[in-house]
């Protein structure tokens, strides 16, 4: 429910007066709780006539983050903010931590001021000294990596020693020191484009590709290190969330000091995260973002990340998927601290379910699935909701022993059927399934639900940060309700936007459908954005991780990232790592008439564009003989001013070889199809043609070059968002998404290429050797073309 219009406009005016922009102000009034809190904060701070934007932003944070167990102290904090004694987000976060720990108890002002850095002025000289010290410590690395140095790490070192330093001054001095040490950027430094500041994407809109624009805006701390948004484990005593019940009561979930101390003793204060995939399908690029968040946070903080298989559905899990997930996680560069399964905890989960019943928070229900759905829609309690605890305990034991038929009973959590949050409608904790479990065997015939097991195992594994995508945000109330009901340790929960990319589908159901029904060639089809498909296509894990890091860990949901952005990162990586070679896709024979038929000239071709002449490994040998092949697209009968290919009477340069001039054209019987070209070469290289062509020659007279198969891939779906087509999404599949060229010619050095090897086919794109290759028959997948459209406008 939104406030009435007259009150809404007054609230908007009030919020704008403290520096909020109109859009933020209007979004705020859609949340009654935040509106009420912010209005109260503004009045408590006595700034109803307005204030500067920095103060207003701090007040907004107080309204949304102040620990509810210390509301009595909020006026004190507001006084410090208005008087500019607390003026940075870092100081404010320290204040929140202080008050969350203090609660409603009295405190000493000097201890509060010390905890928040009040009165501490960090001079530019102090910052300059700290920056100088960090550069001295890391000088060798900086000189090696030059402008590819991770500036975020340098920034973090300075902030660690000077937590109250102005981040803008820190960044400015780091930039100046980099320039002082390295000088102007070289061409090599500039290979990687300057990071652009992106416009905030509108919900459900495809990310717009803007022209490259230089910006002088200072990057935020989150841009330098995306993990700074997450609190430290010792701060996990603050109120995690508030659960509003239909009777007006509020559950404010937080860890007690005793519970948190016990947790910290077990973990040693380290960060513990988990990556919890279901083993019922192959991982896709969205999972790459989840891995970056889960494993990345643990790595950045020197902590641990579990790989935990959420194997609560015995009918869906397969060993194939388990093996695939473990392999892909390692390929992506992540090392699990420990591999666990939810099924490892089946006994503990059962015991806790019994305890939940004993505490009056769960009951055995006999409603059918349709009845449960109907009662939820009507917000009605189940007829069995208030049955005696002993009766539910007995029935739950019978469920466990297999006495009750499948579908005749479930264990449901006694939450709040009248709540505004449908994820509090007495969610199912256990259901009966007479199916053996891939790991637990036939020991169990009841299995826990995701809503029951997920949060409970998080607690049992002492997870500090439970991170998931935004569609799970409404489940947060149920997550904390259950842990609170069982008096268990509560992890810090945070949701981020899921990764959506254009021209594909990432729904597990849809992926499974097109794989099962052979619209594609398996889970690792190179047209899919499954991680195995991307790997088979030739994409590196480094490129995928760079793509994910570039997107950031945001909460702006509903946006779709254009696939060209991913391709940009792929090109950046392969440009540095893929050696150059030459392949002709559609060969056209060229006879060099002024070269003897038995003559073979061995030439040097560059593997790398910046190859040094004194480095033999940077070159490979190519033969130049009387018969060479160019691509059919590089010849036409009629020349034009803007055409740089070969034409009758025209010269071109064969890359790494000689200029050639077309002297004659031989047609097929239809007098239209060009069968071969006759040309003369310029051994002295006196002519300087503008056009440069790639080519492949016979390695010896009469012996054709190596023949290879090349597969060209385009976008799998024609529409940027096929999901918008609802049930008609299959009609959007691009029938031309895969083209196979079976008669391409390659230089002889490629004959020893192995599966997974990546190359740049000059003038064509990046390609990788496919697993379908056999001795004597190489198959290449096109990874990506050479042209980069990301950030250049248009498609």
Swiss-Prot record:
It is found in: Cytoplasm, Cytosol. Its main location: cytoplasm. Residues 188-220 are annotated as: Disordered. Its EC number is 6.1.1.18. A motif ('KMSKS' region) lies at residues 505-509. One of its GO terms (cellular component) is cytosol. The keyword Plastid does not apply. A motif ('HIGH' region) lies at residues 277-287. It is an enzyme of class 6 (ligase). The keyword Transcription does not apply. Keywords: Aminoacyl-tRNA synthetase, ATP-binding, Cytoplasm, Ligase, Nucleotide-binding, Protein biosynthesis. One of its GO terms (molecular function) is ATP binding. L-glutamine binds at residues 310, 450. ATP binds at residues 278-280, 284-290, 469, 498-499, 506-508. Residues 200-212 have a biased composition (Basic and acidic residues). Disruption phenotype: Lethal. In heterozygous plants, aborted ovules. It catalyses: tRNA(Gln) + L-glutamine + ATP = L-glutaminyl-tRNA(Gln) + AMP + diphosphate. Belongs to the class-I aminoacyl-tRNA synthetase family. This is Glutamine--tRNA ligase, cytoplasmic.
């Amino acid at each position: 429910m939104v406030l009435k219009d007259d009150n809404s406009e007054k609230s908007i005016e009030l919020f704008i007066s403290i520096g909020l922009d109109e859009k933020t102000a209007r979004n705020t009034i859609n949340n009654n709780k935040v509106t009420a809190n912010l209005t109260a904060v503004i009045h408590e701070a006595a700034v109803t006539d307005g204030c500067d934007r920095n103060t207003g932003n701090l007040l907004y944070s107080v309204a949304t983050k102040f620990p509810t167990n210390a509301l009595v102290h909020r006026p004190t904090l507001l006084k410090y903010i208005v008087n500019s004694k607390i003026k940075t987000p870092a100081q404010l976060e320290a204040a929140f931590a202080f008050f969350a720990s203090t609660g409603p108890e009295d405190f000493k002002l000097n201890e509060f001021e010390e905890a928040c850095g009040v009165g501490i002025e960090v001079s530019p000289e102090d910052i300059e000294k700290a920056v100088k010290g960090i550069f001295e410590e890391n000088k060798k690395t900086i000189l090696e990596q030059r402008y590819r140095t991770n500036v975020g790490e340098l920034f973090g070192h300075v902030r660690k020693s000077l937590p109250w330093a102005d981040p803008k001054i820190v960044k400015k001095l780091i930039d100046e020191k980099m320039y002082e040490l390295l000088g102007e950027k070289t061409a090599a430094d500039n290979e990687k484009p300057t990071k652009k500041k992106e416009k905030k994407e509108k919900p459900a809109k495809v990310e717009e590709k803007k022209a490259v624009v230089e910006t002088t805006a200072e990057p935020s701390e989150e841009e330098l290190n995306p993990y700074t948004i997450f609190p430290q484990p010792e701060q996990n005593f603050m109120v995690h969330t508030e659960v509003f019940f239909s009777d007006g009561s509020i559950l404010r979930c937080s860890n007690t000091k005793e519970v948190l101390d016990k947790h910290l003793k077990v973990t040693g204060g380290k960060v513990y995260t988990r990556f919890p995939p279901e083993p019922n399908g192959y991982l896709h690029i969205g999972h790459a973002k989840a891995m970056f968040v889960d494993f990345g946070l643990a790595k950045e903080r020197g902590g641990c990340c579990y790989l935990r298989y959420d194997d609560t559905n015995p009918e869906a899990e397969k060993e194939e998927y388990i093996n695939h997930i473990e392999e892909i996680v390692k390929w992506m560069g992540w090392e699990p601290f420990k591999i666990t399964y939810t099924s490892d905890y089946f006994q503990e989960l059962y015991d806790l379910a019994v305890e939940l019943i004993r505490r009056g928070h769960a009951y055995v229900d006999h409603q059918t699935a349709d009845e449960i759905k109907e009662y939820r829609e009507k917000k009605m309690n189940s007829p069995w909701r208030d049955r005696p605890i002993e009766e539910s305990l007995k029935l739950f034991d019978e469920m466990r022993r297999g006495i009750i038929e499948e579908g005749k009973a479930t264990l449901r959590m006694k939450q709040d059927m009248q709540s505004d949050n449908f994820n509090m409608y007495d969610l199912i904790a256990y259901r009966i399934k007479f199916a053996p479990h891939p790991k637990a065997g036939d020991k169990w015939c009841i299995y826990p639900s995701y809503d029951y097991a997920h949060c409970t195992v998080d607690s049992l594994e002492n997870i500090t940060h439970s991170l998931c995508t935004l569609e799970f945000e409404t489940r947060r109330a149920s997550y904390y309700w259950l842990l609170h009901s069982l008096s268990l340790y509560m992890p810090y929960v945070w949701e981020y936007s899921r990764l959506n990319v254009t021209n594909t589908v990432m729904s597990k159901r849809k992926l499974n459908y097109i794989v099962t029904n052979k619209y594609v060639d398996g889970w690792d089809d190179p047209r899919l954005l499954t991680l195995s498909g991307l790997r088979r296509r030739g994409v590196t894990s480094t490129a995928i991780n760079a793509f994910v890091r570039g997107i950031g860990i945001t909460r702006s949901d509903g946006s779709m990232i254009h696939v060209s952005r991913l391709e940009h990162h792929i090109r950046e990586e392969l440009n540095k790592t893929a050696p150059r070679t030459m392949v002709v896709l559609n060969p056209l024979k060229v006879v060099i008439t002024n070269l003897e038929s038995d003559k073979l000239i061995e030439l040097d071709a560059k593997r790398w564009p910046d190859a040094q002449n004194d480095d033999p490994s940077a070159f490979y040998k190519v033969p130049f003989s009387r018969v060479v092949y160019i691509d059919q697209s590089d010849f036409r009968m009629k020349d034009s001013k803007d055409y740089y290919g070969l034409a009758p009477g025209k010269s071109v340069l064969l890359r790494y070889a000689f200029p050639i001039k077309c002297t004659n054209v031989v047609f097929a019987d239809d007098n239209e199809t060009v069968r071969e070209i006759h040309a003369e070469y310029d051994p002295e290289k006196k002519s300087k043609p503008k056009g440069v062509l790639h080519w492949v020659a016979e390695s010896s007279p009469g012996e054709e070059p190596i023949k290879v198969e090349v597969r060209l891939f385009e976008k799998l779906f024609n529409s940027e968002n096929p999901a918008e087509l609802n049930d008609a999404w299959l009609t959007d599949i691009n029938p031309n998404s895969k083209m196979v060229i079976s008669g391409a010619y390659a230089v002889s050095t490629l004959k020893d290429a192995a599966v997974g090897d990546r190359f740049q086919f000059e003038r064509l794109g990046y390609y990788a050797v496919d697993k379908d290759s056999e001795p004597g028959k190489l198959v290449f997948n096109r990874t990506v073309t050479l042209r980069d459209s990301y950030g250049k406008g248009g498609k």
